Regions:
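C-terminal substrate-binding/catalytic lobe of Rossmann-fold NAD(P)-dependent dehydrogenases
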Residues: 163-169, 178-320, 324-351
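Glycine-rich Rossmann-fold phosphate-binding loop(s) that bind the pyrophosphate
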Residues: 38-39
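N-terminal Rossmann-fold NAD(P) dinucleotide-binding loop
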Residues: 42-43
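Rossmann-like NAD(P)-binding element
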Residues: 81, 86-144
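A short, basic/flexible loop-to-alpha-helix module at the beginning of a structural domain
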Residues: 8-30
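Rossmann-like NAD(P)(H) cofactor-binding subdomain of soluble oxidoreductases
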Residues: 118-183
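Conserved N-terminal Rossmann-fold NAD(P) cofactor-binding segment
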Residues: 10, 63-101, 338-342
Length: 351
């Protein structure tokens, strides 16, 4: 400490940078993220995490050994152009190696099955989850599951049901991307940046999701108030905008037969909120414990997300139409779950 600072602050002042530059292992904590599934989405999730410098170590898994080897090589070849010298590990199908991770992203799926409906992957992705879920948990994993495989809400419910894992540590990407699409569509109508629009899609990550327009705000003012004050600028067809947000992914799919960038960035956003303990409010799929009378399934509502996973779930002021739609959306998730034998304990235990 300089003589001047010593005189001003006192000899016993603990100068915050007194130990700056010391080599102390306690000052550095390695951030590790595993990604299961190296298809279109999983590979782009890994790339987003790498490009944004979110993880210090990436652990990639896939049942296709050749595919995961190629993805690992491609990412390693990018290391000269990204923020940090991230370690990239090829785990093949050795899911137990993910037990060291802070976050495991589930991106296992088969995009061709979801060509017209996210429910198309129902049996494939739930079967895939059974191949790794307990292996990861039984190996000692104590981090956060971020699941983006579709149908997202069903797969999240399955992960919780099969493993008995703390549901707060299972986060579905859910309507996070759909909410971004909603804000973008509203932005196009009213000329306000989507980053300044607070609006959410809720319910199932699928065709039954609902836009929560009654609770939507800009600068703390309800969208309905702004519309009343200046209808020329703020009035628009809510149902049309909701439909555009709901089907945005299929517009992307129509021309390239997959969705990649936005869903990968959405997953990376959740990972960043966890690793940085942001306490960020994001629309995500989480276990219902009585919200609007719903319980026992995962679905999307605005969630506070930090290092421990889902810290709090917010309910919104919904219109009668929105509330009815939310309940119908939850029922659709239950109908999908009812098709799966793991939900029938007797049938599952008989296997």
């Amino acid at each position: 400490m300089s003589l001047y600072l010593g005189a001003v602050l006192g000899a016993n002042y603990n100068f915050p940078y007194a130990n700056f530059g010391r080599k102390d292992s306690d000052m550095y904590q390695t951030r590790k993220i595993g990604v299961i599934g190296q298809g279109h989405v999983g590979a782009h999730v890994a790339n987003s995490l790498l490009m944004q410098g979110i993880a210090d170590e990436l652990y990639l898994c896939d049942i296709n050994e050749t595919k995961v080897t190629s993805e690992v090589q491609d990412l390693r070849d990018s290391l000269s152009f990204v923020p940090y010298n991230t370690k990239i590990v090829n785990c093949g199908d050795r899911y137990e190696e993910l037990s060291c991770c802070d976050i495991v992203v589930n991106a296992a799926g088969k995009v061709a099955l979801a060509a017209t409906n996210r429910d198309g992957e129902l049996f494939y992705t739930t079967d895939a989850a059974r191949t790794f879920a307990n292996r990861v948990v039984d190996a000692g994993f104590d981090g956060i599951f971020v699941s983006i495989s579709n149908p997202c809400d069903v797969v999240c419910t399955e992960l919780w049901h099969l493993t008995g894992y703390d549901p707060k540590k299972i986060i579905g990407s859910g309507c996070g991307l759909d909410s971004a699409r909603l804000r973008t569509e509203i932005s196009k109508q009213i000329g306000i940046s989507p980053k300044s629009i607070d609006a959410y899609m809720i319910g199932e990550h699928g065709f039954s999701q609902i836009g929560a327009f009654k609770a939507a705000t800009i600068a703390g003012k309800k969208l309905s108030e702004l519309e009343a004050e200046n209808p020329e600028k703020y009035a628009f067809d809510h149902m049309q905008i909701e439909e555009l947000a709901r089907k945005g992914g299929y517009v992307t799919y129509a021309g390239k037969q997959c969705t990649e960038y936005a869903v990968a960035n959405s997953a990376a956003r959740v990972c960043a909120a966890v690793l940085h303990n942001e306490h960020a409010v994001l629309s995500a799929s989480t276990l219902m414990t009585g919200q609007y009378g719903e319980e026992g399934i995962f679905t999307s509502l605005p969630c506070v997300i930090g290092a421990e996973g889902v810290e709090e779930v917010y309910t919104l002021d919904l219109s009668e139409r929105e509330l009815e739609g939310f309940h119908k959306s939850c029922q659709h998730i239950r109908d999908n779950i009812a098709q799966l034998d793991w939900w029938d304990e007797a049938a599952w235990n008989a296997k």
